[in-house]
Amino acid sequence: MKRIYIILFIILGIHFSFAQEETKVDENFPFSLLVRYFNYLNHGKEELKTYPVLNQPESYCIWGCIFLMESEDETIKKIAIARLKGIATQLFREGKPVLLTSGMNSANFNITKNVNLEDDNNIIYVSIADCIVTQAQDKAQGIFNHQTRKLIEENK
């Protein structure tokens, strides 16, 4: 029960923080990819009754999946991983392959790299964290980027 409350708290926090920044999201294209909802993905559909938090719109975006990775529940983590792979695949199919970055000055690196999107397979770089990265964020970044790179290699 405690886990459910923690997860609900995280999801509500995501919802309210995104709601306050709605106008800025549209102006910042790479960031808008982090919060874009992919609610047509069916990953975890069977578990929706047991874990209602998985049916929240916020859990169908990259940021939401990263936050779900913070859960101690392995079922929720597996669903988050499947959704991250699905989102990476969908963005690739749309012609917007995305690589997530993090670490010191990653936001500035991304701005520089995204000036010309046609220089390296049309890859869009999006920063999920600048200095401090949690283990879950790092793992989510690795899973997402691995899927994107795999798709790029398969389609060369």
Annotated model-derived regions:
Residues 22-156:
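Short beta-strand and adjacent turn/loop elements
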Residues 1-25:
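Bacterial Sec-dependent N-terminal signal peptides
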